[in-house]
Amino acid sequence: MQTNLWIALDGGTTNTRATLLRGDRVIDVVAESVGVRDSVMHQRSPVLHAVGQCLKVLKERHAIVVDQVGVIASGMLGSDAGLVNVPHVMAPATAGQVAGAAFEWFDETVWPKPIKIFPGVRTGPDPSQCGLMEQALAEDIMRGEETQVWGLWQMLSKDRPQLVGQPWILVWPGSHTKMISVGADGTIFGSYTTLAGELFAAMKTATLLRRSVQDSNEMQYSDEIVDLAAKVVWEQGLLRAAFWTRVADVTGKLDQSQRSAWLSSAVIAADVDALSKHEWLNQKTDALLMIGGDKVRQSLYVRMLKKRSHCRIEALDANYCEHAAALGAVHLAMISNREGC
């Protein structure tokens, strides 16, 4: 479909978002607090409804003519918990390879035209050539972060070409933390994932620690709390540091917002410990490491990674982070159109 008007759908663990773009200019964004985690518990109906609702809102708000807009999707919408399972492309993967592996999905109750869904990227050795140990150490999967990479690559190529004119590593904290190795030409060489965000959410809502943090979203960070939490994790482990949240409550050492900050810092410290042990960081001492995500978490990752690696660290501006996935998906769609995929 030859068009300059796009709706880019992106589904994650906890949210579904639709971005309306004209070319590379973002016009509007709508979101639903529904993700594939809801589908795991309630089949696919929550995600189907969320996607349909996002599309309906944009269509009505902007009087969109269906035949004049291309609808594309990425992220977990292309998984077995999303709209349809689109097989991963193996790394190393170029944007052209991912664009060429797109799948057209149709459900008239969601949108009256087919939606093009892009696959994710899988990292790892050939299972037939290695044992389970090698697979566990090296195998990984991602859906959605590849579009963030190519969206960032597009934006930074225009604004700060010196950053992406060399190999770089992206760390993107979220429900899951992704570390991605990227070539100077945008080729994705692999990914490495942890469960940090979801683990923090589970700890503060589904364990005894809930009594100590009260599911608080107000966190009073300080250099002392962040550094001490990291020290305990790096010397004694996350499980000990996490339980001290309860100790700090019972003994009155920290108030509720400080306890929440302690627990958050401890999980991030464990995450940074895992990232820093990966060969991309412990062998490439001069690697360029770009950190995305929201500003607060980003600052904590930058602080801790400076202590655990010798990489050159660049904190990405929020303007680059906010719409990277949508711009990357449009980049894939334009490649797909150009090559007749």
What do these predicted ranges mean?
Residues 231-274:
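Adenine-nucleotide phosphate-binding core of ATP-dependent small-molecule kinases
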Residues 6-46:
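Short glycine-rich, Thr/Ser-proximal phosphate-binding strand/loop in the N-terminal lobe
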Residues 15, 284-304:
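Glycine-rich phosphate-binding loops at beta-strand->alpha-helix junctions
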